[in-house]
Amino acid sequence: MCKAIEHRGPDGTRTMIRDSVAFGHTRLSVIDTETGWQPLINEDESIFVILNGEIYNFQSLRKELEAKGHQFRTASDTEVIVHLYEDEGLDFVKQLEGMFAIALWDESNNRLVLARDRIGKKPLYYT
């Protein structure tokens, strides 16, 4: 699957495979070119996220989350999604401003979350 879309992300490909889910991501490095690889994983490896797009308000969201005690390992807008989901649950998407398609795997709850921006600017494909 990643091979079919590698032209959309020429800077590298990564995958994550678990018993009941597999994520593939091809990267176009824009924000945090060194550590912003996806799927991005939280500290206890229970939440995985892939983002296609850009979260415009990620810096203000990051400051709010840091004030609540969340610690970040990257400068990526994608990592904000992981922490926001930990904090807000399924309501995390209501806080996001930008153009995006998100796939998030919550290993603890065996839950796949798919979300797009309100306009649907970014495509979201799944099989």
Where do the model's predicted regions map?
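N-terminus-centric sequence/structural signature that marks the extreme N-terminus
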Residues: M1-T127
